[in-house]
């Protein structure tokens, strides 16, 4: 074989076939079993604050979150859950709610049956559901309540709260092994076993496989990839992907995207959450936007029109193309909730905003509608392309406003009738 030949190359670009998993219904949202990969998020409000939690769930839903997890950590939070659900429904929001339980989940669900009924899924952490002789009984209590209420369960192992008895057992076995493994490898094995043993126990109690989702989260990218590859190879439970404690800003976005992107490309993952630490006063909805953009840029789903824009260089000393790209992108995000109903299919739109003649015309032709703004020293004219054909040339001080109007016209023509239709291209000016 030629050294430059890629043995994995293929004629059709795309991810590996999806890992076959058992479908789980969380409320009315299908997870796994070939269903579209689901975006979920988590609030950071005090769940006992009904009004504040309702506002944040509503904001996350508007951003596109299809499942929302809320902390249920004490009696006041458990008592608030049905009121949160009811307030959301009064607003017409039916996004399934997931209760996040640690330490005393068995007690809260038993003492507050309205909470158990209002939630659509319970998250159990096998590392802290109970300790020593209480672990099995407290785990069983939650599973039995889930069965009684016909609810789904996520068994979510996390290496920050890993079952220490299991980890110690595996470490001791490894210490006397003829071929001892690296400590991190043993820890990964403990993560996978924690999830799988708990799932097997839940099935013994009577919880059906189509009621269970598994996760095994770590904060190191390479370890996360290895853990989920192992978990997927050893089971067909629906899988929730997430890099725990990903961090703030670009670091969190890059780390999560790197880890989840590789796993998704390998066909692993049925629902994802991007666990970003928000900036002080920052928008919690950013994690939803990043999750959507990851899935869309990889070709798994379409949520909003894509805006392609060049990075800029010495040929583009003008900031016009940057301002226009930002303006178009922000405009699309704001309008999408209304557009989803008014313009079915608009999420498939591609817009290009380019800054000079080098790649501008070519990239614009690849988009549904694109503009190539003049670079430094170039003729002060901006050709607009529609579906690969030159449509018009914009000049003057209001190029940005005119192009935005053309984008709106394109959307109305192509998607306004409820069915995607060709756009009439008049002679280029």
UniProtKB/Swiss-Prot annotation:
What EC numbers are recorded for this enzyme? Answer: 1.17.7.3
Cofactor(s) for this UniProt protein: [4Fe-4S] cluster
The UniProt annotation puts the region (Disordered) at: 1-21
Asked if the Swiss-Prot or TrEMBL record annotates the protein with the keyword Nuclease, the reply is no
Task: Report the catalytic activity.
Answer: (2E)-4-hydroxy-3-methylbut-2-enyl diphosphate + oxidized [flavodoxin] + H2O + 2 H(+) = 2-C-methyl-D-erythritol 2,4-cyclic diphosphate + reduced [flavodoxin]
Gene3D superfamilies membership: Dihydropteroate synthase-like, Sulfite Reductase Hemoprotein, domain 1
Q: What is this protein called?
A: 4-hydroxy-3-methylbut-2-en-1-yl diphosphate synthase (flavodoxin)
> Which species is listed as the source?
Rhodopseudomonas palustris (strain BisB18)
**What is the gene name?**
ispG
């Amino acid at each position: 074989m030629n050294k430059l030949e890629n043995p994995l190359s293929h004629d059709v670009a795309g991810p590996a076939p999806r890992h076959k998993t058992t479908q789980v219904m969380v409320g009315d949202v299908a997870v796994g079993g070939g269903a579209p990969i689901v975006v979920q998020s988590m609030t950071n409000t005090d769940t006992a604050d009904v009004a504040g939690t309702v506002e944040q769930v509503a904001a996350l839903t508007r951003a596109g979150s299809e499942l929302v997890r809320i902390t249920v950590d004490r009696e006041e939070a458990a008592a608030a859950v049905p009121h949160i659900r009811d307030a959301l429904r009064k607003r017409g929001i039916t996004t399934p709610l997931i209760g996040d339980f640690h330490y005393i989940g068995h007690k809260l669900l038993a003492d507050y049956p309205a909470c158990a009924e209002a939630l659509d899924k319970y998250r159990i952490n096998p590392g802290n559901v109970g300790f020593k002789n209480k672990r099995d009984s407290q785990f069983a209590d939650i599973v039995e309540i889930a069965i009684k209420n016909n609810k789904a369960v996520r068994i979510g192992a996390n290496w920050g709260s890993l079952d220490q008895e299991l980890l110690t057992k595996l470490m001791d076995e490894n210490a006397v092994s003829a071929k001892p493994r690296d400590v991190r490898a043993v820890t990964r094995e403990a993560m996978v076993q924690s999830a799988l043993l708990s799932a097997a126990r839940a099935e013994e109690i009577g919880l059906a496989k189509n009621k269970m989702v598994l996760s095994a989260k770590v904060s190191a990218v390479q370890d996360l990839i290895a853990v989920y590859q192992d978990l997927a190879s050893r089971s067909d439970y629906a899988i929730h992907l997430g890099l725990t404690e990903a961090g703030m800003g670009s670091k969190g976005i890059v780390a999560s995207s790197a880890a989840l992107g590789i796993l998704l490309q390998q066909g692993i993952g049925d629902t994802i959450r991007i666990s970003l630490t928000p900036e002080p006063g920052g928008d919690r909805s950013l994690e939803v936007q990043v999750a959507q953009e990851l899935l869309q840029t990889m070709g798994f789903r379409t949520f909003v029109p894509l805006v392609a824009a060049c990075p800029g260089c010495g040929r583009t000393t003008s900031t016009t193309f940057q301002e226009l790209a930002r303006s178009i992108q922000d405009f699309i995000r704001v309008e999408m909730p209304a557009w989803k109903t008014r313009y079915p299919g608009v999420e498939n739109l591609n817009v290009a905003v380019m800054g000079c003649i080098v790649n501008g015309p070519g990239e614009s032709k690849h988009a549904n509608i694109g503009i190539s703004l003049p670079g430094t020293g170039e003729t002060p004219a901006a050709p607009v392309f529609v579906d690969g054909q030159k449509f018009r040339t914009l000049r003057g001080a209001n190029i940005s406003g005119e192009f935005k109007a053309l984008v709106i016209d394109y959307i109305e023509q192509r998607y306004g009738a409820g069915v995607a239709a060709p756009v009439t291209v008049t002679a280029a000016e």
